[in-house]
């Protein structure tokens, strides 16, 4: 969760790129979706 929050704070471009990488990890789709949603 901390990583997601930091990625969102980093910025839109980096946030999206990192969010895509984190999506590969065994995390719930809801968490990834929330992170991406916040980036938008």
From Swiss-Prot:
> What protein name is recorded for this chain?
Beta-glucosidase 1
Q: How does activity depend on pH?
A: Optimum pH is 6.0.
Keywords from the UniProt entry: Carbohydrate metabolism, Cellulose degradation, Glycosidase, Hydrolase, Polysaccharide degradation
**What processes in GO biological process is this protein linked to?**
cellulose catabolic process
Catalyzes what?
Hydrolysis of terminal, non-reducing beta-D-glucosyl residues with release of beta-D-glucose
Q: Enzyme class, one word?
A: hydrolase
- Activity as a function of temperature: Optimum temperature is 45 degrees Celsius.
The EC number(s) attached to this protein equal 3.2.1.21
Q: Which GO terms of the molecular function aspect are on file?
A: beta-glucosidase activity
